[in-house]
From Swiss-Prot:
Belongs to the universal ribosomal protein uL18 family. CDD domains: Ribosomal_L18_L5e (cd00432). This is Large ribosomal subunit protein uL18. The gene is rpl18. Keywords: Ribonucleoprotein, Ribosomal protein, RNA-binding, rRNA-binding. Pfam families: Ribosomal_L5e (PF17144). Part of the 50S ribosomal subunit. Contacts the 5S and 23S rRNAs. This is one of the proteins that bind and probably mediate the attachment of the 5S RNA into the large ribosomal subunit, where it forms part of the central protuberance.
Amino acid sequence: MARGPRYRVPFRRRREGKTNYHKRLKLLKSKKPRLVVRKSLNHHIAQIIVYNPKGDRTIVSAHTRELIRDFGWKGHTGNTPSAYLLGLLIGYKAKKAGIEEAILDIGLHPPTRGSSVFAVLKGAVDAGLNVPHSEEIFPEDYRIRGEHVAEYAKALKQEDETLYRKQFGGYLVKGLEPEKLPEHFEEVKAKIIEKFEGARE
């Protein structure tokens, strides 16, 4: 362990890999609400947070569990399609709460082009939330719709149905054939839009 008068112990959250304080300061200087996106292996969570000296205040939040509970999502809740739908949901919630713009905060997640955290951003932007971004960071549309999953599932089923049922058991037990994920994605997307905008002709 380092010793001596020049050695400074990093803040606890920095040591635990939870907060990049240099990056956080830059975000706070924008004085805009933050669209905070975090992910785990099986879920994503998004929040609109505003800075408060006594503690950050959460305006609205959304969790991928809501996609299952409120909109009938049957796909995986940690993939790109569900991340986009979560972004759409948090975007509409933010607009309803009077939030028109925000700045993206992905914490310590690496800013990898096309990653699921940027699928959340894409959904929020499509809902009408103004967040500075570059179009190049978004996942391709076919990945957002889950077409890559559907194509892989179709090929795997033809090659090894036992492995297909094992790998996509989570989909099948919910009554969704993974080959039909893009259609299911569009159905759930339409439900979210209808809830906040009303039925579209």
